Every structure is written in structure tokens, then in C-alpha cells.
Amino acid sequence: MHNKFYRGRFAVAPMLDWTTRHCRYFHRQFSQQALLYTEMITAPAILHAKYDLLEYDPAEQPVALQLGGSDPTQLANCAKLVQARGYTEINLNVGCPSDRVQNGMFGACLMANADLVADCIKAMQDVVDIPVTIKHRIGIDTLDSYAFLCDFIDKIQPYSQDFIVHARKAWLSGLSPKENREIPPLDYERVYQLKRDFPQLNISINGGIKTIDEIKQHLTKVDGVMVGREAYQNPALLGEIDQQLFDQNQPLITARIAVENMLPYIEQQLSKGVYLNHIVRHMLGAFQNCKGARQWRRHLSENACKQGAGIEVVEQALRFVTE
């Protein structure tokens, strides 16, 4: 079926240590339409890794890869590899404020150098056919005026039409990455204003969004919505996405259905030597607000890490839950 909607109408945000390939496979059980993102992977890591950092299951599609870096040549070389592996999109991280990221000269600190960001985006888009997008903040430190944000967008828009805007500024020192996701106030109106002032661009909004109703409200003002922590901690939210946001005529995907659909994948991964805990740690929030959710989490947490833990751990945990 032809999808009449913008491809980024709803996306699950890239989250370091969280949106692994196992997490994405689980999220895909809830929604066929949501755009899923990898964790951020740095360009040098991809180019010099001794093992395959680009591995994913085709069932995860559509899936986008988020890159970290600031060397246009390195990023272009990575982009070619990413496209060859079949990813739907490449996203440049210009939003992460951690010290480790800044020391590598990528993430939110790049907002202070829009010309370099433009060079990076252009270098990648010149060598691939898939979209190259950018995820960024509304400002950094004292560079937080609306004029600064517009100038940043204006320099990059010749090379990318897709901007994912975390509706908070970032402090590059003094706040941890976690604090930078919570302390700077959200300014959704500033993102809405960007869409009004740059109507030709695809503008997606990110930050603090938790419910289907909130998502729908944002979609009256911008092209796409990206949800991070809520999608991870309460993945059952994703079970409503196709029906509510994409007019798909299908029943609600419950957490139990999604977990049961995961069982063959879990068995397959266990047969390849993957530890059970590496998969089910992303499933702990599946039954949030359901009777038995605490027992579900406890049983998985206490047993999935044991030597030889298998599919029976998940099957036993399911018996505790009533939706």
C-alpha cells in the first residue's frame, strides 16, 4: 500500500545503549509504520571496527542510522557503506551534549559551526540517494536566539530537507546528558515557528512527548514527531501508532501479542550465542500499568542473566501478567 504520509511522521528516537538491533526488532512488533533509529554510531567506529556495527534484521525496516562525526570525508565514506547495507535514511547527530561526544567534535557542539555541518551533510548527500537528515537542539549555551536557530537552518537547508528538532537548548558544560534532557525548558512553539517560517522543509519535533493525543496535536503544527524515552519505557504506546496515525485498518497490537511474536526471534538469537538478557532488557517496560508488571520485570531481571537462560524465562514471566 502506498504510504500517503511523510516517512518521518512518527519515529522512535536514537538512544545510546537503548535502541540496539534487539530493541528495534521488539518495537517493530508493535508498529509496521514507525521509523526506527539505531543508536548513534561514530564514523571512525564504522570505518575501523573489527566487527559489523551495521548489522540489522530486514524485519526492522524502515530503519535509519544515526551517525556521529564532523569530518566530511569520513562521513561520506560511512554514508556509502550505510546505503549499501539498505538503511532507509542517514541522520547526523547535532544534538547530543555529552562531554565524550564534544571531545570527538560531534553532537550539539556542532551547532556553533553551521558551515561545517552543512559541509558534512553535503558530503554525504553527494554520494548517496537516500535522505540525509539532521537532529539538533533549538540552541546551545548562550547561542539560543530564534535568529541563531534560523541562521543554522538556513545554511543547511540547501543540502537537507529534513530537520528533527529537540525542543530544548543544550548546555555544553555543567549539565549531564540526562539533565540536558530534563532541565532546559521545552519550547514547542519555537519549533512550530520554524515550520511556519520554513514551510518547504520537513520539520519533526522531539522532546517530552508521551501520549497519542500529544503526538496528534503536534502533527497539526509540524510534519513529524519523534518519541524517545516514553517509547522505550512504555513500548505498548507503539501498538496504537499504525491505527491512530497512519489510518491502518488493523487491531491494536497489545504487549502480549508483541512479546509472543518475539519468541521465534529470541530462539534464533539464542542459537547464535546471543545472551537472553541482551534482548529482554529492552522488554521490561512492555506491560507498564498492567496487573503483574512488577513480577514480569522482576522475573526477567533475576533470571535472564543466568547462565543458560532460555525462552522459558520469558514464557514464565508472561504468566504473571494480565492486560
Curated annotation (Swiss-Prot):
The protein's required cofactors: FMN
EC number: 1.3.1.-, 1.3.1.91
GO molecular function, one term: FMN binding
UniProt-listed Gene3D superfamilies: 1.20.120.1460, Aldolase class I (3.20.20.70)
Enzyme type, top EC level: oxidoreductase
UniProt-listed PROSITE patterns: UPF0034 (PS01136)
Binding positions for FMN per the UniProt entry: 14-16, 66, 135, 166, 206-208, 228-229
CDD domains per UniProt: DUS_like_FMN
Pfam family, one: Dus
Active site: 96 (proton donor)
Signal peptide positions on this chain: none
Reaction(s) catalysed (UniProt annotation): 5,6-dihydrouridine(20) in tRNA + NADP(+) = uridine(20) in tRNA + NADPH + H(+); 5,6-dihydrouridine(20) in tRNA + NAD(+) = uridine(20) in tRNA + NADH + H(+); 5,6-dihydrouridine(20a) in tRNA + NADP(+) = uridine(20a) in tRNA + NADPH + H(+); 5,6-dihydrouridine(20a) in tRNA + NAD(+) = uridine(20a) in tRNA + NADH + H(+)
Keywords: Flavoprotein, FMN, NADP, Oxidoreductase, RNA-binding, tRNA processing, tRNA-binding
Site residues by UniProt (Interacts with tRNA): 93, 178, 181, 294, 297
Record's function text: Catalyzes the synthesis of 5,6-dihydrouridine (D), a modified base found in the D-loop of most tRNAs, via the reduction of the C5-C6 double bond in target uridines. Specifically modifies U20 and U20a in tRNAs.
Protein family (similarity comment): Belongs to the Dus family. DusA subfamily.
Protein name listed in UniProt: tRNA-dihydrouridine(20/20a) synthase
Originating organism: Haemophilus ducreyi (strain 35000HP / ATCC 700724)
This protein's encoding gene: dusA
